[in-house]
């Protein structure tokens, strides 16, 4: 499971001209699911993202977590994170999980975040979405559950 996280001053997601999710300060999380992912991967990423110290403290140092600053998450499913561009000119998305597998894991990820007391807004799974945000920093990180300790 891959997550691209962006620190944002505000963000929203629109489907068919209607805003379906919006946050003030917090994180935009673009989440991709692959075939081997499990709920343990969703739990790992939720834990990591909730506690990652990427918000500035009073000294301007990245020393505070999403939980500590009371930030929200705008969570957007994005199968294209598993696009393979090594051959040809068109990405291959065979590594992305099919919707019937990806949707429950995407929902589990959001549930794990909510279980930590984080306000989570979402896009619409599988829809064409317009995501708008004001990057804060900018701070953009990529986290892959396959890189967690114990995975060799």
Swiss-Prot record:
It is found in: Cytoplasm. Its main location: cytoplasm. It catalyses: glycyl-tRNA(Ala) + H2O = tRNA(Ala) + glycine + H(+); a D-aminoacyl-tRNA + H2O = a tRNA + a D-alpha-amino acid + H(+). It is an enzyme of class 3 (hydrolase). A motif (Gly-cisPro motif, important for rejection of L-amino acids) lies at residues 137-138. The keyword Cytoplasm applies. Its EC number is 3.1.1.96. Keywords: Cytoplasm, Hydrolase, RNA-binding, tRNA-binding. InterPro entries: Daa-tRNA_deacyls_DTD, DTD-like_sf. Pfam families: Tyr_Deacylase. One of its GO terms (biological process) is D-amino acid catabolic process. One of its GO terms (cellular component) is cytoplasm. SUPFAM superfamilies: DTD-like (SSF69500). GO terms for molecular function: D-tyrosyl-tRNA(Tyr) deacylase activity; Gly-tRNA(Ala) deacylase activity; Ser(Gly)-tRNA(Ala) hydrolase activity; tRNA binding. Belongs to the DTD family. Homodimer. PANTHER family: D-AMINOACYL-TRNA DEACYLASE 1, D-TYROSYL-TRNA TYR DEACYLASE. An aminoacyl-tRNA editing enzyme that deacylates mischarged D-aminoacyl-tRNAs. Also deacylates mischarged glycyl-tRNA(Ala), protecting cells against glycine mischarging by AlaRS. Acts via tRNA-based rather than protein-based catalysis; rejects L-amino acids rather than detecting D-amino acids in the active site. By recycling D-aminoacyl-tRNA to D-amino acids and free tRNA molecules, this enzyme counteracts the toxicity associated with the formation of D-aminoacyl-tRNA entities in vivo and helps enforce protein L-homochirality. A Gly-cisPro motif from one monomer fits into the active site of the other monomer to allow specific chiral rejection of L-amino acids. NCBIfam families: D-aminoacyl-tRNA deacylase (TIGR00256). This is D-aminoacyl-tRNA deacylase. It comes from Geobacillus thermodenitrificans (strain NG80-2).
């Amino acid at each position: 499971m891959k997550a691209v996280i962006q620190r944002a001053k505000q963000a929203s997601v629109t489907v068919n001209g209607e805003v379906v999710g919006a946050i003030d300060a917090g994180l935009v999380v673009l989440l991709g699911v692959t075939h081997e992912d499990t709920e343990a991967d969703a739990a790992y990423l939720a834990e990591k993202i909730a506690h990652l110290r990427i918000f500035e403290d009073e000294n301007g140092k990245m020393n505070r977590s999403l939980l500590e600053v009371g930030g929200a998450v705008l969570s957007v499913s994005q199968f294209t994170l598993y696009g393979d561009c090594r051959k040809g000119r068109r990405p291959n998305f065979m590594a992305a999980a099919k919707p019937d597998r990806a949707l429950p894991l995407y929902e589990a990820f959001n549930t794990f975040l909510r279980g930590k007391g984080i306000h989570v807004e979402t896009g619409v799974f599988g829809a064409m979405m317009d995501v708008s945000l004001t990057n804060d920093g900018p701070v953009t990180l990529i986290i892959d559950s396959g890189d967690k300790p114990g995975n060799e």
